[in-house]
Amino acid sequence: FYLGIRYGEKDRLLDSLYFKNLIPKRNNVSINSNMLKIFDSPNCNTVEKITSTLLGEPEKSTLTLNDFSHIKDKQEKVLKILKSAVKTNAKGVNILLHGHVGTGKSEFSRLIANVSNIPLYAVKTEDSYGEEAKRTERLADLYAKQQILSRIGNACILFDEAEDVLNRGFGSDGTASKGYLNKIIETTPVPVIWTTNNIYDVDPAFLRRMTYCIEFEKLSEDSRLNIWNRVLKKNELTVSKEKVEELNKN
């Protein structure tokens, strides 16, 4: 497996993860690339650190539910869906957040997971060179996280900026099939929160498989102003009323 190389102590730790069913026993490009990070890091020497390297750190939010009071009824619905899915180990639970850029979709995902006390792990958006990850790389990372987290439990996944995956033209270039993604969505062993800026370009076949969808409309000027004031207060920053209003318009 992992390039056919044996690395003593770290190899035994990886075997421990296999034994505990925390890593699927199959060849996966995303997992193999992360394993190279494990072997290159002298501090990656415990099961916990290896697992952290494979998954990344859980996403954290800096906002509160009050910052999304304009969708309070939908907050409660999503919280119930997420908590129930994790508690019952339900499969195929997918939540789609769509709307304009800058309306808080990603931050809302983090907040809902944090409030539910459910660790949220994001599918990578960059490759190992810091460049934009290809669609196939992101899907491989999604699959790897699904397999690992299904064994750990009490977790969910964020697939941010999913336009390149959920669009109507998915599979037309031969890199993957629509049926393959349908299966990933239908059978996901842990809840996945998807975000997109343009729902009109999402393939209807994928939309039908979403458990719940929320539209994020542009915030009113008053709502934005309230958020600015809360953020400034939380960070103990003093800004003039005129400057806050100027920031609010940008």
Regions flagged by a language model, labelled:
Residues 72-245:
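Walker A/P-loop NTP-binding motif of AAA+ ATPase domains
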Residues 4, 18, 64-66, 97, ...:
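Compositionally biased amphipathic helical and low-complexity segments enriched in hydrophobic
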Residues 2-61:
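Interdomain "pre-motor" coupling segment immediately N-terminal to P-loop NTPase/helicase cores
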Residues 249-250:
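The conserved phosphate-sensing helix
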Residues 58-77:
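Dynamic helix-loop-helix/coil hinge segments at AAA+ ATPase domain boundaries and subdomain interfaces
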Residues 4, 61-67, 124, 161, ...:
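Short, solvent-exposed coil/turn linker segments
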Residues 1-2, 141:
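Accessible peptide chain termini
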